[in-house]
Amino acid sequence: MKHLLTVACLLLGQVFGPAEESPRLDQYTLARGPVVIGGVSQNASGLTYHAKRDSLFVVLDAPQRIVELDLDGSLKRKINLNKFDDTEGIVWLGENRFAVAEEARGNIVLVEFEPKDGGVSWKKATKLNTEIQVNATNGLEGIAYDPLAKRYFVAREKRSPAVFKIIPPKPESDAAPTAILMSLAGRGLRDISGLHYDAKRKRLLILSHESACVVETNQYGIESSRLLLRGGKSGLNRTIFKAEGISLDNRARLYVISEPNLLYVFQKTKSQPTDSDSSGSK
């Protein structure tokens, strides 16, 4: 029996490959930046990575707009958000679909646009009202998406900053989304300004500009590591001021944007070879 279990484990390892180790945030250091974001002068508010286009998408608060960027921060195109209000977060959902968070309205707005589209209408978009207590200065500030569970994560910015799981109703239902408070997520942070969910490794990244850090938690909100965004830490000469958006690409590079229009790129530092690695076989 033990022999059969061993063979089964070996076969599973060949099929799925070894479990991928999750790089801890405290292993990251600045690789590039600050870089001025192309086509943006102010109010960069949210960030997401589009894996199929290998692009970054940034949402602006004023004017209400999305800009698509190359990974170096250069502008590819602009998409106007017609009749949207107080847009503070964005997340890619797959294909040409995105979700945009409206801070004061407390809405998750579902939008879809083709590669050549230059605008999106709020009136024609599907809205999910989170029914989280928000106002013009303390509303939804970040959004992330779990494609496997098909649920969202949203953040309330400050004065009891918090992360909520948002479970949408079934397509045929008129019910409101279900909001579940993640009581452990972001505990001790002065505010929450951005979110990213890494579905591959089942971890949530929580950005705080007032606490100047990114916190890594598991899917239940329990912290496992953090990246410090202060001058003298993580390869930074100066503290990142007003960090507003965060995302990972498919190479595990970490992107942070800050107001008014700056982009920072962090990468995992190369591990130093151990004595056994350097000795090798002779």
List where the protein language model places each region:
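Sec-dependent signal peptide recognition
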Residues: 1-7
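Hydrophobic h-region of N-terminal signal peptides that target proteins for export
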Residues: 8-17
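Sequence/structural signature of beta-propeller domains
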Residues: 16-282
